Amino acid sequence: MYKRQKQPYIRQFENYVGILMGHYPESCEQRGVCSFQNIVEADGSVYPCDFYVLDQWRLGNLNEDSFETIHKRRLESGFVEASYNHTEECKGCRYFMICRGGCRRHREQTGDRPGENHFCASYRMFFDACLPRLKDIARSCMR
């Protein structure tokens, strides 16, 4: 397909190229931090993320709670703020500018200490092999 000039769209790679071009990634997983979302289930229950549709993260229910109440609970939960916690090793990694630590669900905290992304070694292997090519693609897109 690629050789016939019909390039596939692969969100993760498109976001990497965009990051290298100075754009903000559209995928929250590639931002390295969570955003404010309202995931609404069929029963009206609201959660901060589609990967955290769990009782402990339920912010309320649209049938019972106002948006103001739900937003207040989100702030009180510290859900988004917790996603800013990265290990010092992660922040110092040569690939942090493009990896950004990945999704919070892949680096859950243990106690007070931020967790390491369990795909970290894989990301390093990938970027060791592919970052030069991604940079070439980004440069060619900016021409």
Task: Report the location of each language-model feature.
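C-terminal accessory region of radical SAM enzymes
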Residues: 1-20, 51-94
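Radical SAM enzyme core and accessory elements
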Residues: 5, 45, 54-57, 85-143
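Histidine/acidic-rich helix-loop-helix segments that form or flank divalent-metal centers
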Residues: 25
